[in-house]
Amino acid sequence: MKRELAIEFSRVTEAAALAGYKWLGRGDKNTADGAAVNAMRIMLNLVNIDGTIVIGEGEIDEAPMLYIGEKVGTGKGDVVDIAVDPIEGTRMTAMGQANALAVMAVGDKGCFLNAPDMYMEKLIVGPGAKGAIDLNLPLEENLRNIARALNKPLGELTVTVLAKPRHDAVIAQLQQLGVRVFAIPDGDVAASILTCMPDSEVDVLYGIGGAPEGVVSAAVIRALDGDMQGRLLARHHVKGDSEENRRIGENELARCKTMGIEAGKVLRLDEMARSDNVIFSATGITKGDLLDGITRKGNMATTETLLIRGKSRTIRRIQSIHYLDRKDPDVQQHIL
């Protein structure tokens, strides 16, 4: 991919973040997400790429825009696959809480795992513990191997886990081992990235979250020379074996079979992101551990964007001031 595409993709996530911010704290996560989707799609279609959405808002019959298989861009230029999460943290945006982002990752054709929208167990570490993880082993054994690779006592490890009921036993186990636990309500893409940032205390992310977010995380973890393993899990194996959960879970397993993916099998990083020739962009909506959130005063808004180019392993933080009434008219309707 041409490196100048990176700045174009930063504009895409900025527009999505600004659109989501319009609905900040208003209690309507679906409207916020819809606005971000629309703004992201408009901006993507201005970029000189022949792009296909491979991780998006759902199937064509479930989502009007940015659905899996949708073509975006001008149709000219590099042929790329795109993984998007227009708002990573729709609930946080609706409730005015921290760590909401607009996110996208772009790679060469065939770069990303085409994962169904289901659950994924994830274990993620930074470069210092690369090669030290194996989801086939018990969690405690993994943590001891990670601590050994990082040359630190087990009690000095910092592990981030989503604060969900399904993780209560995991959090208790980690605390019993003496590990420091950061329990976050949502936002495992941001938490994944923190494992690889030189100024972050986070050593490990572990837990069960969304598979689409897992693939986005894999792209940036590969770009930053970290390591990750994942395992697709059906809904009834995560949320309880009710009739409804089993129906959804069986459908997920059927989708996996159709797509040639084996649920329950450990997926290595290079199976989820097959190249480090990726560009990743994330713009903060609300202030968080990774990025500052948007501040707005009248017609002006300030954003912070994390832009990562895997080929050169370059990390940029971009602070931008936007005069909203000078934006593309099609975007204005979603941000003003």
Which residues are covered by each model-predicted region?
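N-terminal subdomain of lithium-sensitive/metallo-dependent phosphomonoesterases centered on the IMPase/IPPase/PAP
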Residues: 1-83, 144, 148, 175, ...
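Oxyanion/phosphate-interacting regions
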Residues: 5, 194-336
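General beta-strand structural signal in soluble alpha/beta enzymes
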Residues: 53-57, 82-84, 93-95, 114-115, ...
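Short acidic, glycine/serine/threonine-rich loops at helix termini
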Residues: 65-67, 95-97, 115-118, 169-175, ...
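DPxDG-like acidic metal-binding loop motif
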Residues: 77-88, 92-111
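Acidic beta-strand-loop-alpha-helix segment within the catalytic core
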Residues: 108-183, 288-290, 304-334
